[in-house]
A protein has these predicted regions:
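Predominantly flavin-linked oxidoreductase catalytic cores and closely associated redox partners
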Residues: 1-126, 181
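Generic alpha-helix signal with a bias toward terminal, lower-confidence helices
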Residues: 15, 21, 50-54, 93-95, ...
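FAD/FMN-dependent oxidoreductases across multiple families
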Residues: 77-81, 85-87, 99-219
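Short, surface-exposed, charged/polar-biased interaction segments
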Residues: 29-30, 39, 59, 104, ...
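Polar/charged alpha-helical tracts
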Residues: 53, 116-119, 130, 271-274, ...
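A general structural signal for short secondary-structure boundary/capping elements
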Residues: 54-59, 129-130, 140-141, 203, ...
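Short, surface-exposed, charge-dense and proline/glycine-enriched linear segments
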Residues: 2-15, 59-68, 155-165, 220-236, ...
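C-terminal helical "tail/cap" subdomain of flavin- and related membrane-associated enzymes
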Residues: 187-324
Length: 324
């Protein structure tokens, strides 16, 4: 069966329908992050909040909300583990593993690797003691990252989730793709086939590629800091500074002049972040926290690094009077 269209938008994400046709060149070497995943759905996983309370009733007194109501991240030596709890009793769980710390060993089954990781962390092992997989097998990936050199042509375009993928750490995929939908909608509704549209699509291609590489910078730095949680938390503020600044600029901008995703076009922000990951290896945790706070100060609109928050924010759009 063949289908003809004047313009094709590939929204297949990892399916990469147009990419599979062979006309688009992949170039994952542009990305620094190298991670893989093992994941599944489970039932009867206890509430992490309840486990914390059982261990120490005072441990949650500063929590701004029940942690199980969020997309929970357990930061580990090899990477991190997600818990996404659904209302039907299922929980999506998975390890995202830094390949430099936990390379794929095909001689070890996915189940054995899963059990070895759980056994290494007593609190996680206890949580999964009575949980059970809803599918007989775990899913294990190879490298998660993908990147296409070309994102658009005269009669086709890839949405950001199809153009590339970095990592689920900061959950950027949906927001990035929606920003791409907005931009392609403007292009396709306001231009006709010809030079004007091709110029706009060329700019779209450049922007999406630059934004994906920027997400990679924000993610890769976090993985470099995994060995010290305080450094990891400090560098993660680069993402939150970029996200909150981007949201504010979107609100302040006209529909015709929207900022690049996560302020990827902001050279001052990129410069502020560029050397931080390297500095993490040379600084103590306290020194690195101060360095990150100083570098991000021009973009810190929501009280990031404020000691009273203890790295726990109920929301990141604090009133102007509540930012210290």
């Amino acid at each position: 069966r063949s289908i003809k269209a004047d313009f094709v938008v590939d929204a297949t994400g990892a399916g990469q329908a147009l990419v599979e046709c062979g006309a688009i060149e992949a170039d994952v070497a542009l990305l620094q992050t190298r991670t893989r995943a093992i994941f599944a759905h489970v039932e009867s996983l206890p509430m992490w909040n309840d486990l914390l309370v059982a261990a120490n009733p005072n441990s949650i007194r500063h929590h701004p909300f029940v942690c199980d109501d969020s997309a929970m991240h357990h930061v580990l030596e090899e990477g991190w583990m997600w818990w996404l709890r659904f209302h039907d009793g299922l929980t999506s769980v998975g390890f995202v593993l830094d390949e430099s710390r936990q390379p794929l060993n095909r001689n070890v089954s996915a189940l054995d690797e899963w059990n070895e990781l759980l056994a290494k962390y007593p609190s996680l092992n206890k949580a999964f003691r009575d949980a059970w997989l809803t599918h007989p097998e775990l899913f294990r990936t190879e490298r998660l990252q993908r990147m296409n050199r070309n994102v658009a042509g005269s009669d086709w375009a890839l949405l950001p989730s199809t153009a590339g993928f970095v990592d689920p750490l900061h959950s950027t995929g949906i927001a990035h793709t929606l920003s791409g939908v907005e931009r392609l909608t403007r292009i396709l509704t306001r231009t006709s086939a010809g030079p004007d549209r091709e110029h706009a699509l060329s700019a779209y291609c450049r922007d999406i590629s630059r934004e994906t590489e920027w997400v990679d910078t924000l993610v890769h730095g976090c993985y470099r800091c995994l060995s010290d949680f305080r450094k990891f938390a400090a560098f993660s503020m680069c993402y939150f500074a970029a996200a909150t600044t981007y949201e504010r600029r979107r609100l302040d901008s006209s529909r015709e002049n929207q900022p690049a995703f996560l302020c990827a076009e902001d050279e001052q922000m990129r410069e502020a972040v560029s050397g931080l990951a390297d500095a993490a290896d040379q600084k103590t945790a306290v020194e690195f926290e101060k360095l990150c706070e100083q570098a991000l100060r021009p973009f810190n609109h929501v009280g990031l690094f404020a000691p009273r928050h203890r790295n726990m924010y109920d929301y990141t759009a604090l009133p102007d009077s509540d930012m210290t």
